[in-house]
């Protein structure tokens, strides 16, 4: 297939800038770099014309960056964002449809250089990224001198909701979380303060049913949960979720599983009213002899329908001591509804492997993207960009049935990185010869009752191990009956027709 690749170098504020775009129909890989900046990507959205906007902030400060990409991946506009004596973090892009074209609101937590209390800057930009207005909102509800620890945003028809986590200037840890509501002009409508003992961390905000706002986070102590609020920020419900235990065989061993309290955990409410969660999975295995073992190398995509104590369906990776996987940093799950009233769910995770010779720090070895329906039935699961230091930050479901993955590329040890954007087609292809696309295995249904199937690859042999490491069965082909297995958690070691081996986690729950 014919592809196009071009490298263009030009001057921006007397600084050399390089970008590269490889494009073929819908799929592309675009990179952007500036030698004196280290861009940490925070958000991306699809525009009404099928293009994309990307935001990033300079890791070394004090500026931020906005990029506009065409539907083919060409960089049309790059816009630096700076303010005098202030460090700006472009965190979130929100689209605001206007009668005469599209406008966008960019929400930027900001730190004044004089050490005074943090502010929230609201930028309105037009479709060419020209700044239409700039407004600085004092965070008067913060304690004096407080800085931002984190910020999450959500837009509705008439207002913007924010979960703003503050830290005192003498500490690196959060001290309080403020839920705030602004109108689209940036006027503060109301706010509420939550202390860390009742709401420790906010992972994301999302639209819930009945015109409510959902908040997914750590509601303490060591419990992940979902809070819902009405439009006036009054608490409507509070549920602890995503924890369960399972006995392992007949020896008295048991395993406790819960969603990891991580910044990159995400929850969303799907059109059918169910919840989907993307997170790292923390596994704590307790042996009958008193010994215990903890592992958090796995990523889970789980669906909850009736209550929050056991997933209705889930996809769980399993990694041995040589690798670790974790979800995309700022948005690891997204979904879209198609014209046929279908819902398509995408999850993105980073796969890191540990080098040989006892070195501790893992290095990036690919981005894993999974596409499912809203029942988490997998359409495809693939690894991209095995070669190169690519770290996914955001995944966006796109209107054509595919997705866009954006993130940072470069040397994370030295904290020097550039921007990349990878457009994946609806069928899981990119269409570029230089981008390796590897099929990844998945197992379904999960939890299993009678029959389990291996998808994604042609399985030659599958070995099944219990949590104690004992092999309890093996089968050839892509399907097996598991009725003889006791309820519990099992590891599947799958060898495909290419001789490659992958490991997955399966739950048997009859």
Could you describe each region identified by the protein language model?
Residues 59-62, 111-116, 167-173, 219-223, ...:
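Short glycine/acidic-enriched loop and turn motifs that connect beta-strands
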Residues 391-431:
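Blade-level signature of beta-propeller repeat domains, shared across WD40, Kelch, NHL, RCC1
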Residues 424-444, 470-471, 509:
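Residue-level detector of functionally pivotal "anchor" positions at catalytic/ligand-binding pockets or at interdomain
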Residues 487-510:
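C-terminal tail/sorting-segment detector
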Residues 44, 54-55, 66, 77, ...:
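Hydrophobic strand positions within the blades of repeat-based beta-sheet folds
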Residues 46-49, 95-101, 154-158, 207-210, ...:
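Residue-level detector of Asp-centered blade-edge/turn motifs that repeat once per structural unit
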């Amino acid at each position: 297939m014919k592809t196009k690749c071009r490298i263009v170098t030009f001057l921006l504020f007397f600084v050399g800038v390089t970008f590269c775009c490889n494009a073929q129909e819908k799929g592309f890989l675009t990179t952007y770099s500036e030698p004196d900046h280290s861009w940490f990507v925070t958000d991306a959205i699809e525009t009404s014309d099928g293009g994309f906007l990307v935001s990033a902030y300079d890791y070394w400060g004090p500026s931020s960056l906005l990029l506009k990409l065409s539907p083919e991946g060409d960089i049309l506009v790059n816009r630096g964002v700076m303010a005098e004596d202030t460090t700006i973090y472009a965190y979130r892009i929100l689209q605001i449809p206007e009668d005469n074209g599209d406008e966008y609101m960019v929400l930027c937590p900001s730190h004044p250089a004089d050490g005074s209390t943090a502010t929230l800057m609201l930028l309105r930009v037009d479709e060419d990224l020209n700044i239409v207005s700039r407004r600085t909102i004092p965070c008067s509800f913060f304690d004096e001198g407080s800085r931002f620890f984190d910020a999450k945003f959500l837009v509705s028809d008439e207002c913007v909701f924010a979960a703003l986590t503050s830290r005192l200037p003498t500490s690196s840890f959060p001290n309080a979380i403020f839920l705030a509501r602004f109108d689209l002009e940036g006027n503060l409508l109301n706010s509420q303060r939550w202390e860390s003992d009742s709401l420790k961390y906010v992972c994301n905000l999302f639209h819930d049913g009945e015109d409510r706002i959902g908040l997914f986070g750590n509601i303490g102590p060591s419990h992940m949960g979902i809070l819902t609020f009405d439009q006036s920020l009054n608490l409507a419900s509070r549920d602890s979720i995503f924890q369960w235990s399972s006995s392992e065989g007949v020896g008295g061993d048991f395993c406790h599983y819960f969603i990891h309290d991580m910044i990159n955990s995400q929850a969303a409410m799907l059109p059918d009213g169910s919840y989907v969660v993307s997170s790292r999975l923390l596994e704590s295995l307790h042996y009958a002899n008193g010994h215990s073992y903890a592992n958090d190398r796995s990523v889970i995509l789980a669906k909850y329908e009736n209550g929050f104590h056991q997933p209705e369906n889930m996809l769980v990776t399993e990694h041995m001591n040589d690798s670790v996987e974790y979800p995309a940093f700022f948005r690891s799950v997204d979904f879209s509804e198609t014209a046929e009233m279908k819902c398509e769910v995408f999850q993105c995770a980073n796969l890191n492997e540990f080098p040989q010779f006892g070195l501790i720090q893992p290095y990036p070895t690919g981005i894993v993207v999974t596409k499912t329906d809203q029942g988490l039935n997998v359409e495809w699961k693939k690894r991209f960009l095995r070669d190169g230091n690519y770290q996914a930050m955001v995944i966006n479901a796109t209107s054509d049935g595919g997705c866009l993955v954006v993130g940072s590329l470069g040397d994370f040890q030295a904290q020097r990185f550039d921007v990349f954007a990878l457009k994946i087609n609806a069928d899981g292809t990119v269409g570029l010869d230089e981008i390796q696309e590897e099929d990844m295995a998945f197992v379904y249904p999960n939890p299993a009752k009678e029959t389990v199937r291996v998808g994604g690859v042609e399985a030659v042999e599958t070995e099944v191990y219990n949590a104690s490491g004992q092999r309890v069965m093996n089968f050839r082909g892509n399907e097996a009956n598991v009725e003889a297995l006791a309820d519990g958690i099992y590891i599947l070691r799958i060898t495909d027709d290419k001789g490659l081996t992958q490991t997955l986690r399966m739950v048997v729950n009859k």
